[in-house]
C-alpha cells in the first residue's frame, strides 16, 4: 500500500480528507481480517472468532434480521420468551450497522459480519479525523491521529464484542458536532448525533453523557469554550432535543432494566474507593503499555476483574508517549486536564462506575473516549519538530522502561503446592510474545524519531505507514491469540449452528409448541432454529427469568444453563427434546437420566425425546405458599412446582378456594416416580391447544372447574390477557411465570404482548423529529438571509 504524495500533501484548513482516511482504514481492516476469513473459508465456513462474537453476535444478527422482517413484538426463541425490543436494543436494535444488514437475506447475515466490522473501523477513523482536524493544524497529522484511534487496542480488543465497535465508530461525530455548536455556532448537527448515539446504545450513551460533561467543563475551564447564557441555553435545548429524538428504545429499556438485578449492584464501604485486589491497579497501569491479550484470558495478573472488561488504552507504535509529552508541555490545555481526570476515574472504583450508572461491576468500556483525546494529543505534539527532538525521546524512554518492567512478573520466584517456579504469568510463551510485539512498536517509534530529520517532510507519511503496518502486525497477533486459543472448541461451530439448523428443523416436529434443551452444545442454538431453548446466553432477557431461575437451583447471570440433573425443570418448562452433539454422547450417558429416549439424529446431533413432556399451559389441584416454598431446597424446587402452584398470600386469598394447600407429606414426595405421576397429572389438565404467536400466544382450555392456568412464560408488564374476550388479570406466580384464571367449561385465552413504554417513547421521538426538522429549516432560512444581506 503506497502512502505518500497527494494522500498526505500538507494542507491546513483545506479540503477534507475524510474519504481518504475512511478508505485507508477500511483497506487495513480488510487486510487484518482477510487471512482468517481465508482459513475459515477453506473449510467452507464464514468468519467466526471466539466467545461472545460467536455465541451472541453472529446468532443475534442472523436471528434479528429474520425477526424484524417477519414482524412481531415477542421473541419465543429468546430464552423462555422475552420482548424482542428489550432483549436486543442493547445489542443491535438501534444500530445503523445492523439495519444495513437487513438488505441481505437472514441466512447471509453471518457472512456480512466482517464487512460490517471493516465498515466500523472506517467510520471510526473518519469520525476521529473530522473531530481532530480542528485541533491538529496539519492535516497529515490529523490522519495519523485518526488511524491511531481506529486501530487502538480498545478497538481491536472489542472485535470480540462487535457491537461495542458501533459506539467507537459513532462517538467522534457527536464530539465534533459539540465543538461545531460551541465554537462555530453551527447548531444543526449536534442534536442529530446525540440522537444517533443514544439510539445506537443507551448503555454506552450513559457513559458518553458523563464524558461530555467532563469534556465540556474542561473546555470551559481551559478557555476554549466561550460561554454566555444564550449559548448555554441553546446547547441545553439541543441536548434535550437530541435525547428526545433518540429515546425510541430508551423508555422500554429503562422499564426493563430497573427490574434487572444485574443493573442494581451498588457499592459498599471500601468498594467505593479501592478495588478488591492490588493486581487490578497493576492491570490498569500496564494496559497502557502492553498490547491487549485475548478478552477471555488472564496472563500477567490472576486476581481482580480482568476478563471481558475492555481494559486497554494501548496505541500502536506511539503508545502513551504523546499523552505524556502533551501533559508536560501543555499542562493547562483542556485535553491534558481531560486525560488527567480520566486517569483518576480509572483508578477510583466509584468514579469509574460513573460511566455505568454507578454499578459496582467493574468494566473499562468507556476508555475509547479518553483514547480519542489521547490520539489527538499525540497528533498535536508530533507536528512540533522541537518536541520530537527532546520531549518525545524522554517520554519514549519512560514508555520503554514501564513496558519492560513487566518482565519482573515473568521472573519473580513463585512457590505453589510445594513447587518453586519462575514467574507468576499463566502462559509464559504468550506473555513473551505480547511483550515482544509491544517492544517492537516502541523500537519502530524510536527509529522514526531517530530518522526524523532525514525524513523531513516525509515524516508524517512515514509515521502513518508504520502505524498502519504495525496495526496489521499486532492486530494479527491479537486476533490469532483470541481466535485460535479456542480453535478446537469452535471448530464445529458453523456446522452445528448455521449449517445444521435447516436439517434439525426438518426433523423436529412443528405441529405443537414445545421447548428444547441442548446438552453442552454451542450457545444460543435455539436462535438458529427459531425455537425456545432453555440454554441461552443474553444479558437483557425478561427480568422475570432472572427472578425465577435462582429459586429453582439455576444460577442466572448472563446465561441460562439449567443443569441436566434438574430433570423436573424440563417438565415444568415443557421441554420435549434434548439435542446432544454426537461428540458429547458419552458425557450425556454418564448423567444417567431417566425418561429420555433416542428418537432421531442429524449430521451432528442425537435427538432425545422426553417421555415426561408436559404441553404448555396446565392447571393444578394444589398450591404452595411462599412461606412453605422457602423450606424447599433449590435442587428440589422444580419437583415441588410440578405438584403445586406457588402463590403469594394475596393470591391465596383470591384463588385458594380453587385448589388445596399442599401438605408437608406431599411436599416431601420428590422421587423420580413422584415426578412422573405429577407430569401425568399436569398433562391431563393441560389446555387442549396452545399456539405461540409473534405477539404472544393463544390457548383453548376445557376445565371441569374454575382454575388458574399456568403458562411457563416469563411475567412481563407488557402482557395483557383476555379470557373469552373479557380482559383478565395476569398473575405472576412461581416467582416469575404467568397464570390466568379460566372458568369451567370451554375458554379462549389470548395473551398479547406490547412492549411497555414503546408507544410513548416512539411518540416522543417522532414529535422531537418534527421539532428538529422545523428548527433546522428555520436555521437554514436564517443562514440564507444572512448570506443575502452580506452579498
Predicted regions located by residue number:
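Extracytoplasmic/lumenal acceptor-recognition loop(s) of multi-pass membrane glycoenzymes
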Residues: 466-492, 504-575, 613-675, 716, ...
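Active-site-proximal, structured, solvent-exposed surfaces of multi-pass membrane proteins
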Residues: 11-14, 60, 653, 657-791
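Hydrophobic alpha-helical membrane-insertion signals
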Residues: 3-86, 483-523, 527
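Contiguous transmembrane helix-bundle modules in multi-pass membrane proteins
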Residues: 185, 204, 335-496, 744-791
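Active-site lumenal/periplasmic loops and adjacent helix-entry segments of GT-C-fold
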Residues: 35-172, 196-200, 283, 294-307, ...
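Membrane-interface helix-loop-helix junctions at transmembrane boundaries of multi-pass membrane enzymes
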Residues: 225-233, 322-346
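Periplasmic/ER-lumenal interhelical loops and adjacent helix-loop junctions
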Residues: 52-64, 96, 232, 239-329, ...
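Membrane-embedded helix bundles of polyisoprenyl
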Residues: 29, 117-134, 140-222, 234-254, ...
Amino acid at each position: 500500500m503506497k502512502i505518500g504524495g497527494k494522500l498526505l500533501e500538507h494542507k491546513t484548513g483545506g479540503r477534507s480528507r475524510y474519504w481518504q482516511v475512511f478508505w485507508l482504514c477500511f483497506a487495513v481492516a480488510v487486510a487484518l481480517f482477510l487471512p482468517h476469513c481465508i482459513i475459515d473459508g477453506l473449510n467452507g465456513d464464514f468468519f467466526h472468532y471466539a466467545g461472545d462474537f460467536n455465541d451472541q453476535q453472529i446468532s443475534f444478527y442472523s436471528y434479528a434480521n429474520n425477526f424484524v422482517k417477519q414482524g412481531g413484538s415477542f421473541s419465543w426463541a429468546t430464552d423462555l420468551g422475552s420482548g424482542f425490543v428489550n432483549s436486543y436494543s442493547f445489542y443491535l436494535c438501534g444500530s445503523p450497522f445492523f439495519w444495513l444488514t437487513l438488505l441481505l437475506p437472514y441466512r447471509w447475515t453471518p457472512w456480512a459480519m466482517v464487512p460490517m466490522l471493516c465498515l466500523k473501523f472506517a467510520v471510526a477513523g473518519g469520525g476521529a479525523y473530522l473531530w481532530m482536524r480542528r485541533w491538529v493544524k496539519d492535516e497529515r497529522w490529523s490522519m495519523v491521529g485518526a488511524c491511531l484511534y481506529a486501530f487502538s487496542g480498545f478497538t481491536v480488543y472489542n472485535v470480540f464484542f462487535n457491537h461495542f465497535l458501533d459506539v467507537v465508530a459513532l462517538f467522534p461525530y457527536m464530539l465534533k458536532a459539540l465543538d461545531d455548536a460551541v465554537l462555530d455556532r453551527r447548531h444543526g448537527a449536534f442534536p442529530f448525533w446525540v440522537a444517533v448515539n443514544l439510539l445506537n446504545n443507551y448503555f454506552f450513551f450513559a457513559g458518553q453523557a458523563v464524558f461530555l460533561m467532563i469534556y465540556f467543563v474542561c473546555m470551559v475551564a481551559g478557555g476554549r469554550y466561550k460561554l454566555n447564557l444564550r449559548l448555554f441555553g441553546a446547547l441545553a435545548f439541543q441536548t434535550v432535543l437530541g435525547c428526545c429524538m433518540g429515546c425510541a428504545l430508551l423508555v422500554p429499556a429503562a422499564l426493563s432494566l430497573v427490574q434487572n438485578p444485574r443493573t442494581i449492584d451498588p457499592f459498599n464501604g471500601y468498594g467505593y474507593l479501592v478495588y478488591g485486589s492490588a493486581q487490578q491497579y497493576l492491570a490498569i497501569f500496564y494496559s497502557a503499555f502492553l498490547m491487549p491479550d485475548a478478552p477471555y484470558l488472564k496472563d500477567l495478573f490472576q486476581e481482580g476483574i480482568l476478563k471481558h472488561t475492555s481494559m486497554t488504552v494501548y496505541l500502536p507504535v506511539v503508545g502513551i508517549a504523546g499523552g505524556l509529552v502533551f501533559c508536560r508541555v501543555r499542562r493547562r490545555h483542556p485535553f491534558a486536564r481531560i486525560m488527567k481526570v480520566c486517569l483518576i476515574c480509572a483508578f477510583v472504583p466509584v468514579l469509574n462506575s460513573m460511566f455505568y450508572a454507578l454499578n459496582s461491576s467493574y468494566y473499562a468500556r468507556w476508555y475509547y473516549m479518553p483514547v480519542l483525546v489521547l490520539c489527538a494529543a499525540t497528533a498535536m505534539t508530533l507536528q512540533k519538530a522541537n518536541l520530537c527532538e527532546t520531549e518525545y525521546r524522554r517520554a519514549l524512554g519512560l514508555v520503554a522502561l514501564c513496558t519492560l518492567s513487566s518482565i519482573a512478573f515473568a521472573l519473580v520466584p513463585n512457590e505453589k503446592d510445594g513447587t518453586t517456579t519462575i514467574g507468576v504469568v499463566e502462559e509464559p510463551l504468550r506473555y513473551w510474545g505480547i511483550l515482544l510485539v509491544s517492544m517492537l512498536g516502541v523500537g519502530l517509534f524510536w527509529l522514526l524519531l531517530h530518522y526524523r530529520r532525514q525524513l523531513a517532510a516525509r515524516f508524517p507519511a512515514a509515521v502513518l505507514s508504520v502505524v498502519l503496518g504495525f496495526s496489521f502486525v499486532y492486530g494479527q497477533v491479537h486476533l490469532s491469540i483470541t481466535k485460535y486459543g479456542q480453535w478446537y472448541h469452535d471448530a464445529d461451530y458453523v456446522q452445528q449452528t448455521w449449517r445444521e439448523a435447516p436439517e434439525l428443523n426438518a426433523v423436529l416436529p412443528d405441529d405443537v409448541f414445545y421447548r428444547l434443551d441442548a446438552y453442552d452444545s454451542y450457545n444460543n442454538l435455539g436462535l438458529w432454529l427459531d425455537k425456545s431453548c432453555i440454554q441461552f446466553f443474553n444479558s437483557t432477557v425478561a427480568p422475570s427469568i432472572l427472578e425465577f431461575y435462582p429459586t429453582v437451583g439455576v444460577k442466572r447471570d448472563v446465561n441460562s444453563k439449567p443443569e441436566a440433573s434438574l430433570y423436573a425443570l424440563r417438565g415444568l418448562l415443557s421441554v420435549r427434546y434434548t439435542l446432544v452433539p454426537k461428540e458429547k454422547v458419552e458425557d450425556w450417558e454418564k448423567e444417567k437420566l431417566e425418561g429420555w429416549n433416542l428418537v432421531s439424529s442429524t449430521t451432528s446431533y442425537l435427538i432425545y425425546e422426553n417421555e415426561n413432556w408436559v404441553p404448555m399451559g396446565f392447571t393444578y389441584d394444589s398450591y404452595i405458599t411462599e412461606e412453605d416454598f422457602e423450606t424447599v431446597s433449590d435442587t428440589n424446587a422444580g419437583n415441588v412446582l410440578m405438584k403445586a402452584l406457588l402463590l403469594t398470600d394475596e393470591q391465596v386469598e383470591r384463588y385458594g378456594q380453587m385448589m388445596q394447600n399442599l401438605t408437608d407429606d406431599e411436599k416431601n414426595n420428590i422421587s423420580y416416580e413422584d415426578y412422573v405421576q405429577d407430569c401425568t397429572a399436569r398433562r391431563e389438565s393441560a389446555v387442549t391447544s396452545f399456539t405461540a404467536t409473534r405477539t404472544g400466544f393463544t390457548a383453548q382450555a376445557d376445565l371441569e372447574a374454575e382454575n388458574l392456568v399456568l403458562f411457563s412464560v416469563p411475567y412481563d408488564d407488557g402482557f395483557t390477557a383476555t379470557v373469552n374476550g373479557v380482559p383478565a388479570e395476569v398473575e405472576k406466580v412461581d416467582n416469575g411465570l404467568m397464570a390466568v384464571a379460566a372458568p369451567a367449561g370451554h375458554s379462549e385465552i389470548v395473551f398479547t404482548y406490547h412492549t411497555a413504554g414503546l408507544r410513548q417513547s416512539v411518540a416522543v421521538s417522532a414529535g422531537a423529529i418534527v421539532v428538529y426538522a422545523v428548527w433546522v429549516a428555520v436555521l437554514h432560512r436564517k443562514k440564507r438571509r444572512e448570506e443575502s444581506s452580506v452579498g
